[in-house]
A protein has these predicted regions:
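Nucleotide-activated sugar donor-binding and catalytic core shared by glycosyltransferases
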Residues: 1-431
Length: 431
């Protein structure tokens, strides 16, 4: 075959780009036929706004199509600029709303495969479904859908490749004898603005009792330095009574981390300094003895590396929490939206037993989750207790690794894509 096959991938949040798209694109190196990769980014209330920029940095991706062009193509059939379909291809859903992937497949007349957490709507539009764990398959009740669903493992595990070992990181960070605390304030703008200030204030409280504690912030590639500065002076900082400033590397920064690239440093009024790092999250996770994080991809990645974590979700201002689907549209209604969200968010939260992936997978609490009207003092108290219990941290780390499973899911997904492509275009394709 001389003409490359189109691989159309839908993905639309920071966690999906880093935890799903990147390992799948890497695994496509073994794909049986020549191909071009087109990433469509549908609309998403959780988008950071930087998805297109980050995806464009992935060398194997031929073209990125943003939300507006995606919707135009689906609704009107208007081709995105520079996008010329090959006539043969496959649509792969990795995140967002299945509706967009289903309509893209229909518009292009390509078969489709979906990797989901149990969702199987638009089932007739998909040749196959792939899921990470058996309990996700059990959520479905349609025998026909179950028959075309495969459990392949968690693709996020294939993304985790620390640049340094824990021992090397301890040496580079200069804390061979002291514990390390990693802050992961998220990548979505609304979350980051609120949680960075919350976690920095929490560190102030912890350092007052554990002055030798080493700390670091992993700044998502989806977050800019401008957003970092804004988060330290915005309403989140005012809410928690935080007085802190950000200093880019080389501008009065006191931290050194060997060959690690330090983005800058956060300095608080009380004298606490926290180094910030970009693009080195797995090395930092491997370094940490404990991580403070919000729910999401991070919880799987930390668990895979055996790093204990403390999840916190302050719902002190539920009107600021982004919501999916109809609830998200309702929340955006002028004047009434925020009042409705103040009522909706606590109700949604009450229905969720666990938010951290390791706890969801285990069906019980392995790592603590602090949710609701919470404050930095409370999180600091729990974190100090965990940090002082070295044997407890070690046991939690071992349990976390067992729960999330083994890597290799990305390659198993590629095998499914090959099966679907082979059965659809068997006359025109040879291995």
């Amino acid at each position: 075959m001389t003409k490359p096959l189109d691989i159309i991938i839908t993905v639309n949040s920071p966690g999906e780009v880093s935890g799903l798209l990147k390992p799948v694109v890497a695994a496509l190196a073994t794909f049986a036929w020549p191909y071009r990769i087109f990433v469509f980014i549908p609309p998403c209330p959780f988008a950071s706004g930087a998805e297109s920029r980050v995806v464009e940095e992935i060398p194997q991706v031929n073209q990125v199509i943003g939300a507006q062009e995606t919707v135009r193509f689906i609704l009107r059939g208007r081709l995105p600029a520079k996008f010329t379909p090959a006539g043969k291809g496959i649509v792969l859903f990795l995140g967002g709303d299945l509706t967009y992937a289903a309509f893209l497949a229909k518009r292009l007349r390509y078969p489709a495969v979906a990797y989901t957490e149990g969702l199987t709507n638009w089932a007739r539009s998909f040749a196959r479904f792939a899921m990470a764990y058996p309990w996700m398959v059990d959520k479905g009740k349609n025998p026909a859908v179950k028959k075309k669903t495969a459990v392949i493992g968690n693709i996020m595990l294939d993304a985790i490749k620390p640049e340094y070992s824990k021992e090397e990181m301890k040496r580079l960070m200069g804390n061979e004898q002291a514990p390390g605390l990693l802050l992961l304030p998220g990548s979505r703008p609304a979350h980051f603005q609120y949680m960075l200030a919350f976690y920095v204030k929490t560190v102030e409280k912890i350092k007052a009792q554990m002055p030798t504690l080493a700390t670091a912030v992993s700044i998502s590639p989806f977050v800019t330095e401008e957003q970092l500065r804004a988060a330290l002076s915005g309403w989140g900082a005012k809410e928690w009574g935080l007085s802190a400033t950000y200093h880019p590397a080389g501008e009065h920064t006191s931290t050194t981390a060997g060959s690690l690239k330090v983005l800058g440093e956060i300095k608080t009024e009380t004298g606490v300094g926290i180094p910030c790092f970009h693009h080195q999250q797995y090395a930092l996770m491997n370094w940490a003895d404990l991580a403070l994080t919000i729910p999401g991809t991070n919880t799987v990645e930390l668990a895979a590396l055996g790093v204990p974590l403390l999840v916190s979700i302050p719902l002190n201002h539920p009107e600021e929490i982004p919501l999916e689907g109809l609830a998200g549209l309702v929340g955006g209604i002028p004047l009434l939206g925020k009042a409705l969200k103040r009522r909706l968010v606590p109700k949604f939260q009450a229905k969720i037993k666990f938010t951290a992936w390791p706890n969801r997978l285990a069906g019980e609490q392995i790592v603590p989750e602090l949710i609701g009207q919470i404050f930095p003092d409370e999180v600091a108290e729990v974190a100090i207790k965990m940090l002082r219990d070295e044997s407890g941290l070690a046991k939690a780390g071992q349990r976390l690794q067992k729960v999330v499973g083994e890597p290799g899911a990305a390659q198993r997904l590629i095998d499914i894509l090959e099966e679907v492509v082979g059965s659809t275009y068997h006359e025109g394709f040879t291995r």
